[in-house]
Amino acid sequence: MKNAIKLFILIFIVTGCGESKSSSLVAQEADCENLSHYGEIEICLPEIDGMKEAYSYPQVRERSDLFSYDNNTILGLYLSKENYLAIDNFENEALDDYFKVYALKQFEGIEISKLEFEELGEYSKGNFIEKSWEGVIDKVLNGTIDISIGQPVQIETYKPHEDIITTVLLIKMISGVEERIAVCTLNMVRLKNSLIYYAYYKNYTSAKTLEKVKAKNDYFGYKLLGKNN
């Protein structure tokens, strides 16, 4: 299983991006209006205030820069209200503030124990260039931080819940001719004894962006676990 775990890490890194709270915050919720499937497992996609799950739309599914990995099973894509209102022109829309929920086809049907999940977290360390947030915040604010496209900078790894491992990255993204810095979270979730992933992307706009990203990212994870307990 250790070799499989290493492979999990590699694929997770490639397909993800290009305040900690107690696990007691997750409460089981009944009913589900939006089901997705990963093999024989039913995944309930939670409702998130201010966002719309939109992966069922053909124009969303066809956007190549979001879903170009053959080894991914996309379970859902949550758009901000602004992006959802522009869905008719989705292929050309500059996205911000969105979640992608996915799994890996190669490991469909494989059960992951708590111990293996912890090992997965250990193997994930050191896979990115690491810098402290305090060491880069001034450069981010004044636009002088040096980040190459395809080489994100890891600024934090933490566990908002015992079944979620979160890595926070700074990434450079291009929209047309415009370059921008975004905060991306990569999340590995042990859900129904399987591995599910979600990534959150938010353009960096102020010193409070990181705090807001972590809060919204963690909230999404609690809702996802709560709907699938």
Region spans (language model):
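Short, surface-exposed beta-strand/loop micro-motifs that present aromatic residues
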Residues: 180-191
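C-terminal motif of bacterial Sec signal peptides marking the signal peptidase cleavage site
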Residues: 15-16
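Start-of-domain marker
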Residues: 23-74
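Conserved polar/disulfide-associated segments of primarily extracytoplasmic proteins
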Residues: 65-179
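Core RNA-modification/binding signature centered on pseudouridine synthases
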Residues: 174-176, 186, 218-219
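Surface-exposed amphipathic alpha-helical segments
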Residues: 193-229
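Sec-dependent signal peptide recognition
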Residues: 2-10, 21
